[in-house]
């Protein structure tokens, strides 16, 4: 199983999501069976590390994302990954436009896909403060935990 977590620039939500999901898969001893990566719909930050606030937030929860580097979604990702899970509706619409028609069903909003019912989107913390990063972390970590639960049922 291969999962790609997607946000806008791949420096805040999706690297935190990748880190959270990897950590939860490690806890469940599933990391050898499930590949996780992250990417952005835009290329502005390609090659950059995650935002320092995202690194600090994840580290505060025992997850190190400092070694990750931003990249843009590529056409090959639609073939390679089983699921491309988006942080928000804008990311979803962008990927649905890019995806070949037969592969569009691989693209989904991460929170509803994982069974997180309280909201659909993970708000982008980029223009906010640490409280916004913490709120985003809580959502990606909840999604990560519920993703592991979903994948262990299948």
Question: What residue ranges belong to the model's regions?
Answer:
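Conserved active-site segments centered on acidic
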Residues: 1-80, 149-154
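Hydrophobic beta-strand core positions in alpha/beta domains
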Residues: 5, 85-86
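Helix N-cap/beta->alpha junction signal
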Residues: 14, 88-89
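Phosphate-binding/catalytic loops
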Residues: 83, 89-154
